[in-house]
Amino acid sequence: MSYFESFILALIQGFTEFLPISSSAHLILPSAILGWEDQGLAFDVAVHVGTLAAVVLYFRKEVVSLLSAFFASIFKGDRSKEAKLAWLIVLATIPACLFGFVMKDIVELYLRSAWVIATTTIVFGLLLWYVDKHAELKADEYQADWKKALFIGLAQAVAIIPGTSRSGATITAALYLGFTREAAARFSFLMSIPIIVLAGSYLGLKLVTSGEPVHSGFLLTGIITSFISAYICIHFFLKLISRMGMTPFVIYRLVLGVGLFAFLLTQ
């Protein structure tokens, strides 16, 4: 892998991690079209670190508030809305952890293909469009209860299927439950923090045990590029959806999915 490849891949990861357009659908393009080799475990860990740093920094006030309330609820019996939301995020994380543990090998073996990604990109794009147009968008994240958190968590679990998009699935589920677009996005982004931590830790453990060589220059490129691009993406995404809704991302998903099908049919 060259510095140019590491920059492009980290840029793609950073820009697509938090948009409802599927990072896996985009990361397959360089290998499918340009023949680039797999970036390896070390680089995967690096871009996880970069995107995690971006979302934590952007929502630093919320993260500090939720963490403080979470521990206060354990040691002091805090029952504030922040403590409740923190526990709901924990609950929403459980389905993805269980589903990932049980289904990881099956997904890797049978579902990690360009055909699956093209299909899920279109199907879940249409689902996002329907929900965005027909659901009541009134509630914020603090009005969630354990049933809603679990439902959104199950949507996050489904997103282990390549092309679905973790943020796309969770935002779609939150919109269906009546969250405003901004609240759905915030809840999705806050939910991403424990998932990215767990996924990055798992990949880091695999890296340590694999003995894979580490190129510090490529890793630094990956961390910095994914951090900057993810931070910019979060900022402008929240501003865009308040004015235009999810339609631009639905259109993009449909174009991408059709484009992938067209490319695959010519091979």
Swiss-Prot record:
It is a multi-pass membrane protein. The chain crosses the membrane at residues 1-21, 39-59, 83-103, 111-131, 149-169, 189-209, 218-238, 245-265. GO terms for biological process: cell wall organization; peptidoglycan biosynthetic process; peptidoglycan metabolic process; regulation of cell shape; response to antibiotic. Its EC number is 3.6.1.27. It holds the Pfam family BacA. Disulfide bonds: none annotated. It is found in: Cell inner membrane. It is an enzyme of class 3 (hydrolase). It catalyses: di-trans,octa-cis-undecaprenyl diphosphate + H2O = di-trans,octa-cis-undecaprenyl phosphate + phosphate + H(+). InterPro entries: UppP. GO terms for molecular function: undecaprenyl-diphosphatase activity. GO terms for cellular component: plasma membrane. The keyword Membrane applies. HAMAP family: Undec_diphosphatase. Bacitracin is thought to be involved in the inhibition of peptidoglycan synthesis by sequestering undecaprenyl diphosphate, thereby reducing the pool of lipid carrier available. Catalyzes the dephosphorylation of undecaprenyl diphosphate (UPP). Confers resistance to bacitracin. This is Undecaprenyl-diphosphatase. It comes from Vibrio cholerae serotype O1 (strain ATCC 39315 / El Tor Inaba N16961). The gene is uppP.
